[in-house]
UniProtKB/Swiss-Prot annotation:
Signal peptide span: 1-23
Pfam families: DUF2015
Protein name, UniProt field: UPF0357 protein AAL017W
Keywords: Signal
Family: Belongs to the UPF0357 family.
Amino acid sequence: MFGLISLWHLFWLAVMAGILVVAHRNRETIRYKTSEFMVRLRSRFGGYTSINDHFVRDLEDGFSSQNFDLTSANSNDTRSGLDEASKQEIRRIMEEQGLGFDQARLVYTTRKFGAHGIAPDGMPLDPKVVTFRR
C-alpha cells in the first residue's frame, strides 16, 4: 500500500514539475496573452483600459502581436494606430495568404518599400546612391 501511494505521489509530482517547466519556458507568451485578454475583457464590459481607443479597436481586430504589442502603457499616445487603408491591406494579406499579423505586416512593409525604390533589407535600389560601410 505504501509503495502505491508513493508512486501515485511521484507521478503527480512529475506532472506538476512538467507543467511548471512548460509554463516557465513560455512565460513571455503567457504574460502577453493574459495582458491582451484582460484588455479585451475590460473593454467589452466598459471597464477602464490604459490604452487609447484607436489601439483598443486595433487590438480587437487582431492587429497586435508580441512583437507589435498594443497593450503597453500608451494611454497618452496621440497616434491613431494604422490608417484604414493599411489595415484593410494587411487584413487582406492575412486572409489570402493565411498569415499572422507579424508576417502580414512584413509582407505589407516589403511591398511598400518596393514601391518606393527600397530593397527588403532597407537599402535603396537607386544605382546612383552612394553608401558608406563601417
